[in-house]
From Swiss-Prot:
Homodimer. The lineage of its organism: Bacteria, Pseudomonadati, Pseudomonadota, Gammaproteobacteria, Enterobacterales. SUPFAM superfamilies: GHMP Kinase, C-terminal domain (SSF55060), Ribosomal protein S5 domain 2-like (SSF54211). Its EC number is 2.7.1.148. One of its GO terms (biological process) is terpenoid biosynthetic process. This is 4-diphosphocytidyl-2-C-methyl-D-erythritol kinase. It comes from Enterobacter sp. (strain 638). The active site is at K10, D141. ATP binds at P99, M100, G101, G102, G103, L104, G105, G106, G107, S108, S109. Gene3D superfamilies: 3.30.230.10, GHMP kinase, C-terminal domain.
Length: 289
């Protein structure tokens, strides 16, 4: 039987770069929150040990796709620990709604959903901590999606502290460009020395994103999108872009602004969620097993 699993988007409500390690990775402080909008992963268990991706992505080999990599990672970890069932395998499809290179965490969210869903469907019995550790090998943002709760992240994004920021309404806009993360992080003008602050201090300050100045300088459409949004509400870049978002207290206020969006700017309205749709789904599945 085909099962459906949410793969939600995330926003970085703030993002500050606090340094750069000897290995090149940047240290940061960021606040992750989920929204009630994203991709949908479809999974039908198989009995023959095969992993099939039903919806390949253009220009990405199936074996390089994060969905397939996540499934194979779980197979290997389960086999190594004696938790792999005798009959396993899966047909996996994805209905994409999140843009690639948009800063919404689409690929990381897909990987996390596959780890969580297959662990449940195959009965592997990995804990959330174990799945998060596996997920970190796929990408720095995967653990927060596995854990499924809004979080303050430090280090290179792997040190997570659960938090509960206000669940506002957001107008999230895609300016029609894709920004590879290295383009931003390799820019020599990227701020890399923002002072480390406590979460208590950060929550009292106006939120910002150190990557925004670079994205606006290098991508004209990102600059134009933010300039337009800032006329209506507090707005900023999410992640390294390219998506930008504005925050509102009500859904109707967000939708009124979306209706006025220029033709070249595509967007949607979503509610902030401190417990992700994936976490809600797995809790419901566990409760009614």
């Amino acid at each position: 039987m085909m099962t459906q699993w949410p793969s939600p988007a995330k926003l970085n409500l703030f993002l500050y770069i606090t340094g750069q390690r000897a290995d090149g990775y940047h240290t940061l402080q960021t606040l992750f929150q989920f929204v009630d909008y994203g991709d949908t992963i479809s999974i039908e268990p198989r009995q023959d040990g095969e992993i099939h991706l039903l919806t390949p992505v253009d220009d990405v080999a199936s074996e390089d796709n994060l969905i397939v990599r996540a499934a194979r990672l779980l197979v290997q970890a389960a086999a190594n620990s004696g938790r792999l069932p005798e009959h396993y395998g899966a047909d996996i499809g994805v209905e994409k709604r999140l843009p690639m290179g948009g800063g919404l965490g689409g690929g990381s969210s897909n990987a996390a959903t596959v780890l969580v869903a297959l662990n449940h469907l195959w009965g592997c019995g990995f804990s959330q901590d174990e799945l998060a550790t596996l997920g970190l090998t796929l990408g720095a943002d995967v653990p927060v999606f596995v854990r499924g709760h809004a979080a303050f992240a430090e280090g290179v994004g792997e040190i997570l502290t659960p938090v509960d920021p206000p669940e506002k309404w957001y107008l999230i806009a895609h300016p029609g460009v894709s920004i590879p993360t290295p383009v931003i992080f390799n820019d020599p003008e990227l701020p890399r020395n923002t002072p480390v602050r406590s979460i208590e201090t950060l929550l009292k300050c106006e939120f910002g994103n150190d990557c925004e100045v670079i994205a606006r300088k290098r991508f004209r459409k990102v600059d134009a999108a933010l300039s337009w949004l800032l006329e209506y509400a507090p707005s900023r870049l999410t992640g390294t872009g390219s998506c930008v978002f504005a925050e509102f207290d009500t859904e109707s206020a967000a939708r009124q602004v979306l209706e006025q969006a220029p033709e070249w700017l595509h967007g949607f309205v979503a509610r902030g969620m401190n417990t992700s749709p994936l976490q809600q789904t797995i809790l419901a599945q566990t409760e009614f097993r």
